[in-house]
């Protein structure tokens, strides 16, 4: 999990990442994200909406096993982050790392 956290941080710093559930859903409706990450404690209603639009857009959803506060910490933010959309992972290998983790059965949606 430390590798995924390191990759999330690098993607936030060097890539194009949008934080927040409302923005994530808007981008999913447009089919723009390459990956969506949701915190384990993301409210069920929001998570269901994200999963619905992600399925329509054929975008993988990774469930981060920590809380939204933990995800905010990893992103370097002093607030909760229930979900985030990755448009470009920059210098990180976040998308490949998460896909590999999901194939191995680590917290897939």
Swiss-Prot record:
UniProt-listed Pfam families: Ribosomal_L7Ae
Family annotation (SUPFAM superfamilies): L30e-like (SSF55315)
InterPro entries given in the database record: Ribosomal_eL30, Ribosomal_eL30-like, Ribosomal_eL30-like_sf, Ribosomal_eL30_CS, Ribosomal_eL8/eL30/eS12/Gad45
Highest taxon above the source species: Archaea
UniProt keyword terms in alphabetical order: Ribonucleoprotein, Ribosomal protein
Sequence intervals crossing the membrane: none
Single GO MF descriptor: RNA binding
The keyword Iron-sulfur appears for this protein: no
Gene3D superfamilies noted in UniProt: 3.30.1330.30
GO terms under biological process: translation
GO cellular component: cytosolic large ribosomal subunit
Family listed: Belongs to the eukaryotic ribosomal protein eL30 family.
Classification via NCBIfam families: PRK01018.1
Name of the molecule in the record: Large ribosomal subunit protein eL30
Originating organism: Methanopyrus kandleri (strain AV19 / DSM 6324 / JCM 9639 / NBRC 100938)
Lineage: Archaea, Methanobacteriati, Methanobacteriota, Methanomada group, Methanopyri
């Amino acid at each position: 999990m430390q590798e995924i956290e390191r990759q999330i941080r690098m993607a936030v710093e060097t890539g194009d990442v949008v934080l927040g559930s409302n923005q994530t859903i808007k981008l999913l409706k447009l089919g723009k994200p390459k990956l969506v990450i949701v915190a384990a404690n993301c409210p069920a209603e929001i998570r269901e909406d994200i999963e619905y639009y992600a399925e329509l857009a054929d975008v993988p959803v990774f469930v981060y096993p920590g809380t939204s506060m933990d995800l905010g910490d990893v992103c370097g933010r002093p607030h909760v982050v229930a979900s985030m959309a990755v448009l470009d992972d920059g210098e990180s290998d976040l998308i490949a790392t998460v896909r590999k983790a999901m194939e191995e059965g680590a917290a897939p949606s």
